[in-house]
């Protein structure tokens, strides 16, 4: 088989593509990446690198010369440029018409509503109702927001930033959801309609950045089943090929929210691998990165099932401006029982930047999911990683 047919192109070269590049050889595949920086993590492992901006259509055309299919590490792409390339026979997975309703958060919310899935109340910033919704609000950039960037909690009119120079249609407002937990689920589908759905996980955010993830989430089985069902519905409706992550709000149980369907709100979709799925590298039979590659190349999908009782993934976030390698801390983390450390090799550290992660496993497959178990390990990891 020609090398081009066994090479997957990835738009993006960060840590998600880096982890894909680690999995590719095990599947008999090569990886080519389109990324702007020579020091981006995936550059060191990719078989071919196109150094250009993520949204550069000509760069994507060059990428396509080296691969049989192109997939995505992030959603910061220029869809019209890609559509021109698709018309010339370049294959993208997910397909561009499946991506189209997901890239803009406003359009994504309407897509979910039309599918009959519950979402928080939301409005375009330019068309707020005459009777303003109660504070607090969540102000969101409709595109290019991630890790808390492009999201702001608005507690009063005084908190509103000056957006007078913002292009129309670039911001939206939604009601703040007083949730009990934040959950996530990742699903994968290939062109034959075969699917794998990972266990539902709980995510812990601090300052709107994910700090840790516990899998499976310690929640009622009916709630987990509902979240996974929503994932299947979205994948099938879009005739999706690739990987999709869904973030949820779980509302507190009450007389107003007695059923799983009433307690779950869909927050956001991400048409790519996701931070909430990093645990799968060490805790599942097949990682999210391997499943994405299998799906977009038409391979049989591996199992997404856990091969341990429980796992907790802790992000290693930057807390200073530095170029250090943090080897002493990494060695201590690696010495923790059933620990797996992943260091992304980024050239510089700054506060809040995701530099790596560590996953810790409970090998007892008969154990019940426990928040206390996860929180104890998170404390151990963060005591090692962060200075006093």
UniProtKB/Swiss-Prot annotation:
Sorted alphabetically, the keyword list is:
ATP-binding, Ligase, Nucleotide-binding, Purine biosynthesis
> Pathway, per UniProt?
Purine metabolism; IMP biosynthesis via de novo pathway; 5-amino-1-(5-phospho-D-ribosyl)imidazole-4-carboxylate from 5-amino-1-(5-phospho-D-ribosyl)imidazole (N5-CAIR route): step 1/2
Write the Enzyme Commission number(s) for this entry.
Answer: 6.3.4.18
Q: May I have one GO cellular component term?
A: cytosol
Which residues belong to any copy of the ATP-grasp domain? Answer: 109-297
Reactions accelerated catalytically: 5-amino-1-(5-phospho-beta-D-ribosyl)imidazole + hydrogencarbonate + ATP = 5-carboxyamino-1-(5-phospho-D-ribosyl)imidazole + ADP + phosphate + 2 H(+)
Molecular function GO labels: 5-(carboxyamino)imidazole ribonucleotide synthase activity; ATP binding; metal ion binding; phosphoribosylaminoimidazole carboxylase activity
The family annotation for this protein states:
Belongs to the PurK/PurT family.
Main function = Catalyzes the ATP-dependent conversion of 5-aminoimidazole ribonucleotide (AIR) and HCO(3)(-) to N5-carboxyaminoimidazole ribonucleotide (N5-CAIR).
How is the subunit organization of this protein annotated in UniProt? Answer: Homodimer.
Write down what this protein is called: N5-carboxyaminoimidazole ribonucleotide synthase
Origin species: Synechocystis sp. (strain ATCC 27184 / PCC 6803 / Kazusa)
